Amino acid sequence: MKSLMQAKPFILLFLLTCSKLLSNSPQLGVPPEFKDGPEIIISDWHIGTTMWQLAVLKSIGMPVEAYSLSGHRRYALDNPSFHENPLFVNLGSWSEEKVREEFAKNNRYSRLTHVLCSFPPSYITAFEKLPPQVALLLNIGHRIHISASPNDFTQRLVEMKRNPRYTIAAMSEYDFHYMHYYTGLEPLRLPVISQHISQKLRDAPYAPCNRVVLVGPSHNTTRIIGFDNNLEYLNRLSATFAARYGLKPYTFKFIKSLYRNDQATMENLAKHPAVLINPYSAFSISMVELYHLNIPFFVPDDSLLINTMDDVRLYPIYQNREAVAHLEMQYPVSTSGYPYSPNDESTEAQRYWMQFMFFNQVKHAQRWTDPDDLFRKLYLHDLCQLHDDMQAENAELFNEQLKVWAALFGRDKKIENISEQ
């Protein structure tokens, strides 16, 4: 075989050109603007809170990486902004000395200025082990007392609010008021905007491909409020109402049963004419995503939700009665500025705190009081107009919040809308 030096001149020129191009190209799989490492890292235990905030930060031009600890990490396997590193996996258990030693070894973190954490809120304290020049942003995703000693973390949050290293925000109106009740302090409002949903889907006209109404949110597999949790009964009443008006009936199906094995993609969900929401918490990412897809959104009236939502108070899921009683004694309602505690189980307290829940904060959630009311609004109202109204509402929210995020990181002039994440 001839040696390289014996090859024809044009081959040598070709090889030299390729070598120069490769040496000047960015790292494989790393966007050119991010090749020198992130300025902000997102890391917590909830894939939903990570995905929407990652998309927002990318939209304003922030070099960002995500290190998810969630069991649902599989939802982001094809997202090159998600990374793995033992430092973030072991952050909670390693000593501060070990964390800073490992941090210093990684040149990719030399530009890091911020870490963002949302769930559970108390996990933000683990990031205090990072060098002190790294600022910490907590955007509370679900109540501050989840996975924490209620009394201890309440006081810790007050201390954080006074510490310039911290920025404390809330991604729901409920969490804003929950924190205000227990601390007397007001976090920054950074509500969920589902920027990870493509611009194409968010701008799409109302064009359902079927007559299947989704029963959600996505994690709901059994609950149908107002219909005794009986899907067959719901579909029978729907067919009867449709026949009365000579209309083709809608069929209701749970999202999880319709789309198994993680097939409930945004594209698939957007094909449906409407969604029947059965709230189990004050807000959930999957609930917000459905609204931000502009799918006509039907929710039981507040009167039907009394004693049906099991994930709005600390007891019994997150704390025992004794722990909650002690918390209420330490932070009595009389000093809170509110008429009721968010952990009060009374009917009056439940009604009061419902005003801060997601479905009562948006403009176009369709509330219904009984089956006939639901079917009248579903069959006889203009769902296309409802979709368009939701679309306008959501577009305004997204535009406003992108500006807030840009200002927070000094990126006011660099907002860019990206159509695909």
Task: Map each language-model feature to its residues.
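Catalytic core of nucleotide-activated saccharide and alditol-phosphate transferases
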Residues: 118-210, 216-221, 336, 346
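Cleavable N-terminal signal peptides of Sec/SRP-targeted secreted and luminal proteins
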Residues: 8-20
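Structural motif
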Residues: 42-48, 68-71, 92-94, 115-122, ...
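Conserved catalytic-core segment of nucleotide-activated headgroup transferases in glycan assembly
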Residues: 178-181, 185, 192-265, 286
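N-terminal pre-catalytic "stem/leader" segment of glycosyltransferase-like enzymes
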Residues: 19, 24-126, 403-420
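C-terminal alpha-helical cap of glycosyltransferases
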Residues: 376-384, 394-421
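Catalytic binding pocket for nucleotide-activated donors in carbohydrate/polymer assembly enzymes
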Residues: 279-280, 284-396
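Acidic donor-binding loop of glycosyltransferase active sites
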Residues: 270-279
